[in-house]
From Swiss-Prot:
Deacetylates O-acetyl-ADP ribose to yield ADP-ribose and free acetate. Down-regulates ribonuclease 3 (RNase III) activity. Acts by interacting directly with the region of the ribonuclease that is required for dimerization/activation. Substrate binds at D11, I12, N25, G33, V34, D35, S122, T123, G124, V125, Y126. InterPro entries: Macro_dom (IPR002589), Macro_dom-like (IPR043472), O-Ac-ADP-ribose_deAcase (IPR024900). Belongs to the MacroD-type family. YmdB subfamily. This is O-acetyl-ADP-ribose deacetylase. SUPFAM superfamilies: Macro domain-like. GO terms for molecular function: O-acetyl-ADP-ribose deacetylase activity; purine nucleoside binding; ribonuclease inhibitor activity. It catalyses: 3''-O-acetyl-ADP-D-ribose + H2O = ADP-D-ribose + acetate + H(+); 2''-O-acetyl-ADP-D-ribose + H2O = ADP-D-ribose + acetate + H(+).
Length: 177
């Protein structure tokens, strides 16, 4: 099962997959962290696409996802999802984070994408504890792919060594069950 899930230490903006996931803010207008990096690398086309989505449906609430073209990125599309802001764990954060991953996967599936790359959603300025967020990510994706043939390849693209090791350890433990 886990042969479809991979961990990469690197820059998500350089990964050549069908879709990359952007840990966006509700405005979809770019920001800090991975969101800002994706917007900078994609160029003005991405901001224009996000503005079109905003005009059509307004902001993207936590747990939801929308899809746009990828601009100058090597990916075909960007799936923008909004993870929850960590507020101590008593405000439905786990469910919202699960939904962010699940809705991103469903958009990839609906668009026929066979490969998708995820950052560690909500673990930057949104403050979600890394280990808890990684467990939700791995469990959500593993459960999704056990029932579906697509996407064929899923990548967790981790910006730092500590997060990379965390995802590798979780996937190894899951493979042992």
């Amino acid at each position: 099962m886990n042969s479809r899930i991979h961990v990469i230490h690197g820059d998500i903006t350089t990964v050549a997959v069908d879709a990359i996931v952007n840990a966006a803010n509700p405005s979809l207008m770019g920001g800090g962290g991975v969101d800002g990096a994706i917007h900078r690398a994609a160029g003005p086309e991405l901001l224009e696409a996000c503005m079109t989505v905003r005009r059509q449906q307004g902001e993207c609430p936590p747990g939801h996802a929308v899809i746009t073209a990828a601009g100058r990125l090597p990916a075909k599309a960007v799936i923008h999802t909004v993870g929850p802001i960590w507020r101590g764990g008593e405000h439905n954060e786990a469910q919202l984070l699960h939904d962010a991953y699940l809705n991103s996967l469903n958009l990839a599936l609906a668009n026929g994408y066979q490969s998708i790359a995820f950052p560690a959603i909500s673990t930057g300025v949104y403050g979600y504890p890394r280990a808890a967020a990684a467990e939700i990510a791995v469990n959500t994706i593993s459960e999704f792919i056990t029932r579906r043939a697509s996407p064929e390849q899923i990548y967790f693209v981790c910006y730092d060594e500590e997060t990379t090791r965390l995802y590798q350890r979780l996937l190894t433990q899951q493979g042992d069950q």
